[in-house]
Amino acid sequence: MENYNQTSTDFILLGLFPPSKIGLFLFILFVLIFLMALIGNLSMILLIFLDTHLHTPMYFLLSQLSLIDLNYISTIVPKMASDFLYGNKSISFIGCGIQSFFFMTFAGAEALLLTSMAYDRYVAICFPLHYPIRMSKRMYVLMITGSWMIGSINSCAHTVYAFRIPYCKSRAINHFFCDVPAMLTLACTDTWVYEYTVFLSSTIFLVFPFTGIACSYGWVLLAVYRMHSAEGRKKAYSTCSTHLTVVTFYYAPFAYTYLCPRSLRSLTEDKVLAVFYTILTPMLNPIIYSLRNKEVMGALTRVIQNIFSVKM
């Protein structure tokens, strides 16, 4: 029997897993995905740190993406799993605010970081001679700190505003985490002003970055087409297609949830789509970036050989 343990300020997360065998199967599946995401992203961070061949702006940005994904999925899955395991789906008002803040911080930072990674590839392929200047250490450190800071500021503003809205007696959030669009359905007041604010923020963090990424890769594909080296074209296509796959997995469901009017989508759709950008993407990113990347696989081989040579 589920024990909500609710107080007047608690929210109830209805969750993703039904109380049945299917729910148990999904619980086990998502815990395995969570563990894969932890192992994959931690391995990517350690690999880039340990292998000097990967000490480049491209891989430094990739290590930050892994760090964001690691925190991203850790903000959502442990609470969701414990809710199902112990049957206590309540979350305090403050706890909900903290989860919402970190979720939006990591989401915003990842959107901006993916744009920085696209710019990095654009400069590397279209202006290779200018790459050391345009992507200096100062530049990529600014990109990373800027992504984190802007994501945090945006998240702080939304969290403070969302948690000052009066909520009705029904505190049941039809979601598996404290997502603002799902919470707005419980508000006792008209939230159209805030919804427009969310739309504007989503445009800044989704539409503008995606447009920048699309333009960058448009120029990249044109430059690749003009390359004389077949090996160079193959490497460039591989790198770009990998990044575009990650971008599509992340941006498409996010854009539908936050830019599509509430009347044209259901809360069930929001929950299913949220699985893509909160759980599946953090698990898939290290796999996508490593399987098709000879430099990463080569670095992995070198690190393993060094470990065994030290032991011997």
Curated annotation (Swiss-Prot):
Residues 49-56, 120-138, 219-235, 292-312 are cytoplasmic. It comes from the Eukaryota. It is found in: Cell membrane. The chain crosses the membrane at residues 25-48, 57-78, 100-119, 139-157, 195-218, 236-258, 272-291. Glycans are attached at residue 5. Disulfide bonds join 96-188. One of its GO terms (cellular component) is plasma membrane. One of its GO terms (biological process) is detection of chemical stimulus involved in sensory perception of smell. GO terms for molecular function: G protein-coupled receptor activity; olfactory receptor activity. Odorant receptor. Belongs to the G-protein coupled receptor 1 family. This is Olfactory receptor 2L5.
